[in-house]
Design a protein with these regions (language model features):
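Extracytoplasmic
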Residues: 1-324
Length: 324
C-alpha cells in the first residue's frame, strides 16, 4: 500500500497457509500465503495450484505468485485435500477428485455404507504428482474392477457394488468395455482406486518442478498408514520442490534418470516425450541445493542414448545434445 518494491532477486515460497509464519520468521523468506490467508482462495491462489490438474495451469499460478519453491506436506494428501478443493472452488468442492459408491456392510446384511473412490483427476493434481509421485511419470498397474447397479435408496438413485476385484489396468480396461457394451439395464462397470499411490490412468511427469529436499521423518510417524502399503510406509512427511525452466532434449520415447535424495532414498524420474521433445528438471552432475542428486545420466530407454545435463542447462533452459 505504501509503494514498497521487492528487489529483483526476491521470490515467494508456495505452501499451504499454515506454513506461512514459519517461512517468514524461521526461513526469512516470503510465503505466498500465511494464516492471514492472502493469495489462498480461488483457482489462481495457492489452493488452485495444489488442485490444478495440469502442469501448465499450476506453473501459471506459481508464476503469478512469483514462486521459486513449493513445500508439500502429506497432510495435503490426506485430511487437508478437501479443504484445498473447497478453497479453490467452493461450488464443485471435491466432486472432480473423489466420488462415492455404496457397498453392503458385512453381507448378507442389507445395510449400505459409503465407499469413497478417487477419480483420474485426483491423481493429476499437483499435490499428488509432487508429493506422492515425486514429479515422475507413473503408469497404472493394479486397479479395482467394479460392477454396480442403480438402486433406489431413500428417494434417490445410488450406485451399489455388485462385484469388485483387483485386476491389472490393461485387463480392467478390456473388462469394462466388454461389460458395458452389453450391460443389463441399470448395470454398469467402472475402474476405481481407493489408494493414493495407484492411479487409474498414466500420469505425466512434471517438467519444471524438481525435488530438492525431503524431511527425514516419514509420514507414517504422524499419520495412520496401512502396513501393507510399502510405498506409503516410506513416504516422507514434507518435501520441497524448486521451479526451473528445464533443459530440452530432442528424442522420442521415455527418458529416465536415477536419483538419490538427501535422506538416502533412491527413485527414478521418468518422462515420456511430447512431440519429439523432453524437458528435464534435474542436472546429472552436482546436486540440488537441498541434497537431491543424480546417480547416473539421462537415458532414453528405447535407444539407449545417454545425456549429461548441467545445472546451468536446467536453469537457463538450454538444448542438450546426447552422448551416443
Amino acid at each position: 500500500d505504501r509503494g514498497y518494491s521487492y528487489p529483483p532477486e526476491s521470490y515467494g515460497i508456495l505452501a499451504w497457509w499454515d506454513y506461512g509464519h514459519w517461512i517468514t520468521f524461521m526461513a526469512k523468506r516470503i510465503p505466498n500465503s500465511n494464516p492471514f490467508q492472502d493469495n489462498l482462495a480461488g483457482s489462481s491462489g495457492v489452493a488452485g495450484f495444489f488442485t490444478a490438474t495440469s502442469e501448465g495451469e499450476g506453473a501459471n499460478i506459481a508464476a503469478k505468485l512469483k514462486s521459486k519453491y513449493v513445500i508439500t506436506d502429506f497432510s495435503l494428501v490426506r485430511g487437508n485435500f478437501a479443504a484445498m478443493a473447497l478453497w479453490s472452488d467452493p461450488t464443485r468442492g471435491t466432486t472432480p477428485f473423489q466420488a462415492v459408491i455404496y457397498r453392503q456392510n458385512n453381507p448378507p446384511s442389507s445395510e449400505l455404507v459409503q465407499q469413497p473412490i478417487f477419480t483420474p483427476d485426483y491423481y493429476n493434481t499437483m499435490i499428488i504428482r509432487m508429493h506422492i509421485f515425486d514429479g515422475s511419470m507413473v503408469t497404472p498397474e493394479e486397479v479395482i474392477y467394479i460392477e454396480f447397479r442403480d438402486q433406489s435408496y431413500e428417494g434417490r438413485t445410488i450406485p451399489v457394488i455388485v462385484k469388485s476385484q483387483y485386476v491389472n489396468a490393461t485387463e480392467g480396461a478390456a473388462k469394462i468395455k466388454s461389460f458395458n457394451a452389453a450391460a443389463p439395464a441399470g448395470m454398469h462397470a467402472i475402474l476405481a482406486s481407493i489408494e493414493v499411490t495407484k492411479p487409474l490412468r498414466e500420469v505425466p511427469a512434471l517438467q519444471h518442478f524438481r525435488l530438492v529436499y525431503e524431511s527425514p521423518q516419514n509420514a507414517s510417524q504422524y499419520y495412520q498408514i496401512s502396513s501393507t502399503n510399502v510405498q506409503l510406509q516410506d513416504m516422507k512427511s514434507i518435501k520441497i520442490f524448486e521451479i526451473v525452466p528445464g533443459a530440452t532434449i530432442h528424442g522420442t520415447g521415455t527418458i529416465e534418470i536415477p536419483l538419490e535424495t538427501n535422506t538416502g532414498r533412491s527413485f527414478v524420474y521418468r518422462q515420456e516425450s511430447v512431440n519429439g521433445t523432453f524437458v528435464v528438471p534435474y542436472a546429472t552432475g552436482g546436486g540440488t541445493p537441498g541434497g537431491v542428486r543424480a546417480t547416473g545420466k539421462y537415458t532414453i530407454i528405447e535407444t539407449g542414448r545417454t545425456y549429461e545435463v548441467t545445472d546451468d542447462d536446467v536453469r537457463e533452459g538450454r538444448v542438450v545434445n546426447g552422448n551416443g
